[in-house]
Amino acid sequence: MASAVLSSVLTTASRFALLQVDSGSGSDSEPGKGKGRSNGKSQTLGNKATSNEKKREKRRKKKEQQQSEANELRNLAFKKIPQKSSHSICNVQHELSSPNPAQKESREENWQEWRQKDEQLTSEMFEADLEKALLLSKLEYEEHKQDYENAETASTQTKGINKKDKRKNHQGKDKPVTVSLKDFQCEDHISKKAEESNSAQTLSHDGGFFNRLEDDVHKILIREKRREQLTEHNGTDNSPAPEHNQEVGLKDGRIERLKLELERKDAEIQKLKAVITQWEAKYKEVKARNGQLLKMLQEGEMKDKAEILLQVDESQSIKNELTVQVSSLHAALEQERSKVKVLQAELAKYQGGRKGKRNFEPDHCR
């Protein structure tokens, strides 16, 4: 909207640039003429004087244009209607009275250009306002969506209550029913909510509501443009060729703007696609690294487990061998013990027999 306002300011400021200021030209040219008549100078001096006068007029025009532009900008900034000065009105009347065909043609061309610019600006501003209104309506609908849902539930409840009331009324038609003020207000509030819920349901069920609304807005714009063209045609007896050219120019300008927007959006999409591909490549790399790390960890764990199991098996086999050796040694020890006992018994017998023989021999000698 700010850009539209600035553009409108520029257009209004530049309109007054087309007006010529001839108020001081007469006063400055008259003494020159008098001097030429009185003194009777040559043509060269007259040309120089006219060139100087033209330069002065140009300077004055520039100053007046700058002043008018500054005043209009001030008035627009403080929301005041720009008041045309009497000096500018006199200049306009003087220009209209001067019958110069070249100036008339240039004015008509400039007028047509400014009219085209004004129409384009007004149409763009109107479309922008309509788009804003559509967006606001969408936002309001989204904000009040839950309210509509609550209203739907309330409407279902009210329907059930109304059915019960109807049954009661059918049963007792002759009996007058008294309703309190609170109940009456509640019923009105519930009925309003039910109407709002019904409208919300129609909006929610109709998915293409906003699309149809945009189409209607486009149709309205086209109708208004046609009406403006017809009014201009009736007011000013001009041929329909420039109007058609204006329509074509407006359409071409819109098409070019849309093409530029599409190109810009396509470039943004391409950039986003490139970023997505980069992130996908990085994601795949990270995934592959994680898979390799997981495999390495699993292999390390399996190796550790296998080594531990081998050590356990070896220790178990060593234990079995040692138990076998111990059992065999224990059996050999028992055998040796039994042998020792037998030998001890034999030795004891042998010693006892020798003692008896020794005792028997001396007795026999006596």
From Swiss-Prot:
Keywords: Coiled coil, Golgi apparatus, Phosphoprotein
Biased composition (Basic and acidic residues): 104-115
Interaction with IRS1 as annotated region, ranges: 1-95
Tissue-specificity statement: Predominantly expressed in testis. Expressed in the adipose tissue (at protein level). In the testis it is restricted to spermatocytes and early round spermatids. Also expressed in cardiac fibroblasts.
GO CC list: Golgi apparatus
Region (Disordered): 20-115, 146-175, 228-250
Residue ranges with Polar residues bias: 39-50, 83-103
Coiled-coil region: 47-77, 128-160, 250-299, 326-353
GO molecular function: identical protein binding
Transmembrane annotation, as ranges: none
An annotated GO BP: positive regulation of insulin receptor signaling pathway
Residue numbers of Phosphoserine PTMs: S23, S25, S27, S106
Subcellular location: Golgi apparatus
InterPro entries the record matches: GKAP1
Superkingdom of the organism of origin: Eukaryota
Induction notes from the record: Down-regulated by TNF in adipocytes (at protein level).
Assembly and interaction partners: Interacts with PRKG1. Interacts with IRS1.
Family, as annotated: Belongs to the GKAP1 family.
Function, in words: Regulates insulin-dependent IRS1 tyrosine phosphorylation in adipocytes by modulating the availability of IRS1 to IR tyrosine kinase. Its association with IRS1 is required for insulin-induced translocation of SLC2A4 to the cell membrane. Involved in TNF-induced impairment of insulin-dependent IRS1 tyrosine phosphorylation.
Entry protein name: G kinase-anchoring protein 1
Organism name: Mus musculus (Mouse)
